[in-house]
Amino acid sequence: MKFEKLGQSGRARRGRLTLEHGVVETPIFMPVGTYGTVKGMLPRDIEDIQAQIILGNTFHLYLRPGLEVIKQHGGLHDFIKWNKPILTDSGGFQVFSLGAMRKIKEEGVTFRSPIDGSKVFLSPEISMEIQHVLNSDIVMIFDECTPYPATHEEAQKSLQLSLRWAKRCKAHHHDELKNKNALFGIIQGGMYEDLRDESLNGLLEIGFDGYAIGGLSVGEPKEEMIKVLDYLPNKMPHDKPRYLMGVGKPEDIVEAVRRGVDMFDCVMPTRNARNGHYFVTDGLVRIRNSKYRHDQGPLDPHCDCYTCKNFTRAYLFHLEKCGEMLASMLGTIHNLRYYQRLTEGMRDALDKGTFDEFVQDFYARRGLEVPPCPVDE
């Protein structure tokens, strides 16, 4: 993996990632394809919205279809017919979300499969092996996602376990498996700056190809998340990619880019589309609202996606009211293209030196003031 920093405006960065299956321009949003499919999208649709990289999930693919099936296809790329880069989440977050169904020990995590109730064991080594079989371009370490809220003591204990696991992940990925693909560390520590520092410094000692901010978007108020983003990205290596996991709303992504984050993923655009909530240049359209029954305009006049070029809001309203599958499909195409256009717009503005104007326009269209952002002297 190679990461080049191509430009900067304040803390916002313009970069380029070169991976085994292609080049990724940053800032970038990665559509989530948990089970080896982005819900409601054909692989050609994902190409049409100009996604450069997608996300798969180690935990779910390990349970179904299992490694043997994917091995027979020579990896996840051939299995799902996607020839561009793939990042895989290690499974740590999914194990965290199982709650009482899991037991965490030093060796790893034992849990009941949410599919058939059978006992399953996941460890740092097993996670690395699964992701090696998947042939992920970016492999994430197996960690414990610190819950919110957590006391200082709980968050510290959790991050120290994650650091010991991180060391095992690196050893297995590099030394045992000889995997040449990128391996990213994940910073934990809850909402405590001293613990975030401890986690980051521990990961830097081990050494990774990129660094992710974990443990956000887990139920904390937005102010708490912004507080972490005010200080943490700027402490992360300036010559490595920075990834904010599981975030988020368009405003959250803009604010994180302003603070120096490069990569994002979130289920929000796909999930919201299935509920008739569409992201547009001026904010949000809730298509089930009866005011759209006779609306002859496109969903977003500024959008170049298949949905906006071909269908009216009235038609989308009709599909939603009828409970038609096509409503979710067209909505997902649009929402994911919106997120790609958002990050494209930021890249373009960073290239042209007009990033501040981009941010002003983004908020002005929503009738909002630009929030404050830390400035380096």
Curated annotation (Swiss-Prot):
InterPro entries in UniProt: ArchSynthase1/Queuine_TRR, TGT, TGT-like_sf, tRNA_ribo_trans-like
Keywords for this protein: Glycosyltransferase, Metal-binding, Queuosine biosynthesis, Transferase, tRNA processing, Zinc
One MF annotation (Gene Ontology) recorded for this entry: tRNA-guanosine(34) queuine transglycosylase activity
Binding positions for Zn(2+) per the UniProt entry: 303, 305, 308, 334
GO CC terms: cytosol
Active site location: 89 (proton acceptor), 265 (nucleophile)
Protein residues bound to substrate: 89-93, 143, 188, 215
GO biological process: queuosine biosynthetic process; tRNA wobble guanine modification; tRNA-guanine transglycosylation
Major enzyme class: transferase
Reactions catalysed: 7-aminomethyl-7-carbaguanine + guanosine(34) in tRNA = 7-aminomethyl-7-carbaguanosine(34) in tRNA + guanine
Segments for region (RNA binding): 246-252, 270-274
Cofactors: Zn(2+)
Cofactor annotation comment: Binds 1 zinc ion per subunit.
Self-association state and partner proteins as the record states: Homodimer. Within each dimer, one monomer is responsible for RNA recognition and catalysis, while the other monomer binds to the replacement base PreQ1.
Similarity annotation: Belongs to the queuine tRNA-ribosyltransferase family.
PANTHER family reported in the protein's UniProt record: QUEUINE TRNA-RIBOSYLTRANSFERASE (PTHR46499:SF1)
Name the record gives this protein: Queuine tRNA-ribosyltransferase
Gene designation per UniProt: tgt
